[in-house]
Amino acid sequence: MTEGNQQKQFDSDSFLRHLTHQPGVYRMYDESGDVIYVGKAKDLRKRVSSYFREKVDRMKTQVLVKQIASMDVTVTNTEAEALILENSFIKKYRPRYNVLLRDDKSYPYIILTSHQHPKLGFHRGARRAKGDYFGPFPNGSAVRESLNLLQKLFPIRQCDDSYYRARTRPCLQYQLKRCLAPCVNVCTDDEYNEQVALAKQFLQGKNQQVIDELMNKMEQASTDLDFERAARFRDQIAALRKTQERNSVTGSQQELDVIGLARGNGMTTVQMLFIRDNHLQGSRSYFPKVPTDTPDDEVLRAFLLQFYLSDTAGRKIPREVVLPVDVQPDNVLAEVMSDALSQPVKLQSSVRGDKRQYQSLAQKNAVNALESRLNQQSTMNRRTQALQQVLEFGVPIQRMECFDISHTMGQQTVASCVVFDQNGPKKSDYRRYNITGITPGDDYAAMSKALAKRYDNAKEQGNIPDILFIDGGKGQLAQAENYFNDWGKEAPVLIGVAKGESRKPGLETLIMAGSHETIPLSKDASALHLIQHIRDESHRFAITGHRQKRAKVKKTSTLEQIDGVGAKRRQAILKNLGGLQEVKNASIDKLASVPGISRSLAEKIYYSFRDE
């Protein structure tokens, strides 16, 4: 099968049904598993559901939704916290549908300049100006919104230096109580720098510390009978409390991992939050296999050892790990981790302040991830049972496999084999096979070779699927039939999955081996949804492998490595186009204009140098 535009259908109804109303960040993935969009929400369910309304006005949203193959979320305590995490994810994943696909130097920042009377301002680009930078922010409007808030809270100038130098009397900002007018010496340097220091602490996330300092200053001003100054501090405190959102993401921890644990219905979720440089840099859910009735502390001890100390893990141990329960009454585990890091490592469960909020946040995400996984498992079990009934299986279906072929113009052919059981994808059993020694573009031969690679040496009956899906029509299915006719063992049930004319989900034709009769299923049948899921996963896995192989070839690709381009044609191409770089940049029409180069060969040359 040539790489096409087959797109996995995202089950938005099922996802939204169990989505929380809490604030957080959502990530959208395409069929290749790449993050294509990151967003934040005050109400996750309300925001995410807006993408799947029947009428969506924005063309960008329509295009984006068509590309969604899966989604996941990270719950946060506040919308402000979600904003910071959203920015972290955008930097990490660089999603193509987010606006900010650029380097850090192009992200906007707030700058507090190094000046006798520092100013707060908007900055983008190289950091040549001296001062303190705060950010980056996800977009310019976020910076301007923050500057507007800061101007209301701290009377610090935001004017250009040239405007500042030209003043002979206070401007309107002074009248609005948004600047102390240091330009004309209305305030002292100490008074101005006092506000600068408070603004800096606020930008560092030390909100409560700012309020505490203002309270002390207000009380001191009252004691000194400076009631006007005391009133100014009082108003400042009121404004801060009104706008304050305690954000646990910007605490004082420099390097901290926080772990949450949730268990239920035979499943365990361990949730990791990674805090670096005072920010939540990311999160991840793990679902370890845990024997029944294993105590929580034992589960966590085993997880910590495997997560941080495995020879193959390669993870950096943080200086502090916050846990939901105590795991080391004898401190042995902390000593082992400290030895590995060559610095003291704290493992603690009794925490306060920001760490307690991190701990609570990790627990929220653990519960959310567990509920989501249990829902997926329930859906998978229901669909598997439906398929079992359709195929009239007398015993439960234990294992299903699906094959797909991916290539571009017959080059870098890759076959995929994905495996599903009653709980969903079994990714540890996934396999890819590089297909060589066939006529380029011969999908039938590619399928035959892939089956031989997978099953020729399959000696353990437990690894043989109950059902084998073949992504393709009767021709591809016939290759599987021919192979298993001579196999000498009990063959799996073979089913061909042929695409409809428009390749739209729901229009597939399911073909049984032997009789080649079609299996009638409605568009909303659970069994069909399962088959689509398996087929789409096989397609995704094949395309991903093919692209990786093609990209690898591209790095070393030369005309000598392209089938059909011999010495004479190579010489003609270089003579007419001028050099290898010109060949790489040439269009198909330009390549086909070279004497001796056919249209089909021009296409082969063109695609050999491209990833898309």
From Swiss-Prot:
One of its GO terms (molecular function) is DNA binding. GO terms for cellular component: cytoplasm; excinuclease repair complex. It is found in: Cytoplasm. SUPFAM superfamilies: C-terminal UvrC-binding domain of UvrB (SSF46600), GIY-YIG endonuclease (SSF82771), RuvA domain 2-like (SSF47781). InterPro entries: GIY-YIG_endonuc, GIY-YIG_endonuc_sf, GIY-YIG_UvrC_Cho, Hlx-hairpin-Hlx_DNA-bd_motif, RuvA_2-like, UVR_dom, UVR_dom_sf, UvrABC_protein_C. Its main location: cytoplasm. One of its GO terms (biological process) is SOS response. Residues 208-243 form the UVR domain. Keywords: Cytoplasm, DNA damage, DNA excision, DNA repair, Excision nuclease, SOS response. Residues 21-99 form the GIY-YIG domain. Interacts with UvrB in an incision complex. The UvrABC repair system catalyzes the recognition and processing of DNA lesions. UvrC both incises the 5' and 3' sides of the lesion. The N-terminal half is responsible for the 3' incision and the C-terminal half is responsible for the 5' incision. Belongs to the UvrC family. This is UvrABC system protein C. It comes from Idiomarina loihiensis (strain ATCC BAA-735 / DSM 15497 / L2-TR).
